[in-house]
Amino acid sequence: MSTGSSPFVDHKSNNSTISINNNSSILNESSISKAYVSKLEFQLDTIKTENRILQQEKDQITSDYRKIIDEKNQELENLKLNFKYVYDEKNQLESKLTNQEQVSTNNINQLSDEIQTYKRENLKLTKDYNSLLDKFNKLNRKNQQIMHDLNKEIEVNDKLHQELKIKEKTNQELQKASDTAINELEQYSKILDKKNGSDNLLYKNLTTKSNNLQNINHQLQNKIDQLLQNKTSNELLKQQNQSLLHKLQNLENIESKYLQLEIEKLQLETKYNDLFKALDTAIASSNEYKDNENTDDTIHTSKVKSFIEYCNNLQAKNLTLQEKYDSKIIQVKELTKELEDHAREIETDFLPTITDLESKLKVYADQNTKLERTKSLREKEITFLRNSLKQMEQIHANQQHKQQEQEKEENTENKSISQYMTNLEKLVDEYKTKIDELEKKNLEYNKSSIITNEKTPSNKRQRLESNYTFKTQAIELEKENIEISSKLKQAESTIEQLKFKISELDKVETRKEQYRILQLKNNLISQDQFIKQTTLIALRKENEELINKYIKNLPIEEQIPKGVFQRQEDDKQRLQAQIDHLTKRSTRLREVFTKKSKDIITVIAKYFGFIIEFLPNPINPTDLFSRIKLRSRYIPSEEDCYLIIDVENRGLKAHGNFQFKQICEELAQYWVNENNQFPCLLSAVNLKLYEIYASK
């Protein structure tokens, strides 16, 4: 058998492969067609379902629209039914509108009449208000005068108290001196009993003088009692002064209430002006409504109703305001009555006491002059007595010499002389003890002069030992005491002056230290260095924190530096320092401004003749330059006459008596209305016032 392949066999195999391929392609096409058919069927089903849904939606929409059409048809039928009713109502409203227009015109006329009456009442009230203002100003002036008089009386009372203390001290000293003189006179009277007829005459004179001195002492005691009574009366007057001060405080509270009433009055005036404007606009709008009656009836009726309501509200408000105003007038009348009562009380209770005090002061002054005269007379009498005592001592010395010559002849007389000498020695010892007591008292009273007083008794004793009499020593002691007291007073005055100078130096040093501290604080270089140093410290801390966070590999949220906050704080501190510096500068500028403004006002008053004062606006208290008060230098302070210039309203008002107002009106008519020269008006007013008050 051969191994080669036959061609027939090969042909069969090729045909089989072709058939298989054809079958596979047919199968693929059939599957694709089936898939396509299935897709089409699915699409058909979806389209059917969508069509069904759309049909349902269509049915629902048609049903809804049918319902809406039915409802609209019903509404149309209802509107057709209501149209006749509306037409009838329209006719009725038109008739009502005409009636209401007539009523509104009548109401407007009534309101205009009421407005005129209110204006008249307002004018009357303004007149009453001005009269009350004048009364209030008069009462204020009276109160100021009374306060001034009370202060003067208090000062006079204090001076009288001081003078009473001084007089009491002098009276005590005079009593002590008179007691010592009486004791001396009694002792000398014992000695003079043993003398001759010539000595008896001197003794009688001395006794009469001593009796006169005793009478004078009794008179002084009576005067001291009177002064004590006056002291008690002065204390009572002080209590009355305190009660008056309480009453004045109450008057200040009343003044504050009065200012509040003035502010309320101005507010009411503004409200009245607004109401008048509203009425004018309402009347104008009502005229416009009459022109446009046919255009818009419903708007016209609503506006008429609103206007009527507005008028009713206005009437109610006017009634409430009138009640409030009446209550305020009653309060003002009560306050004026209280002020008048206080003024009457002051005039009835305190003016007679003041006159009594003035008369008592005059009496006290006369008494003081009389006391000084009696004091001088007593001093002269004391000197005369001292001289007479010296003469008596000389006579006694001559008699002693005569007795020594007659000792040899009369031994009996020697015994009497020896007794007399022993009595004199005893008197000298008693005087020495009294001198020691007086010296001790002077030492206790004047501690600063201990050394000088310790030296004086030794000198006095030496003088006693060196043939000086007791009376000369007493006179020298009194002179030395007077000199020492004068030196002490001088030393005390110098000490007070030195203390005052030391206190002033301390104040100056404290001010210098404060100024240095302020300079150090406000030094710009030091502030700049301090700010730079703080910023450097903050930047260093920030860099250190950033380096540490970078090394530690912390998350981003924790890597935000805290130095930024510190830098902001430093910026805040710097801004606060700038703010403080600016506030200090502003306060200094204000102080300088006030000083300069005062200087300018004084210069204007000196060279232009008017004292300027800026008054605050009662509506806006912060506005301090809208009103200027001008007071002439030639008007006395007793008369309250001045001019007020209103800068905003360009007005000028004269306040004061009738003569001043008449002068201002005449000069304003000539210089302002005719010549339009306001500065000439001011100079003419000054000249006229100078002519009037210079002639007086």
Swiss-Prot record:
Residues 1-22, 394-415 are annotated as: Disordered. The keyword Nucleus applies. Residues 402-413 have a biased composition (Basic and acidic residues). Its main location: nucleus. It comes from the Eukaryota. It is found in: Nucleus. Pfam families: MAD. InterPro entries: Mad1. One of its GO terms (biological process) is cell division. Keywords: Cell cycle, Cell division, Mitosis, Nucleus. GO terms for cellular component: kinetochore; mitotic spindle; nuclear envelope. Gene3D superfamilies: 3.30.457.60. The keyword Amino-acid biosynthesis does not apply. Central component of the spindle assembly checkpoint which is a feedback control that prevents cells with incompletely assembled spindles from leaving mitosis. PANTHER family: MITOTIC SPINDLE ASSEMBLY CHECKPOINT PROTEIN MAD1, MITOTIC SPINDLE ASSEMBLY CHECKPOINT PROTEIN MAD1 MITOTIC ARREST DEFICIENT-LIKE PROTEIN 1. Belongs to the MAD1 family. Component of the mitotic checkpoint complex (MCC). This is Spindle assembly checkpoint component MAD1. The lineage of its organism: Eukaryota, Fungi, Dikarya, Ascomycota, Saccharomycotina. The gene is MAD1.
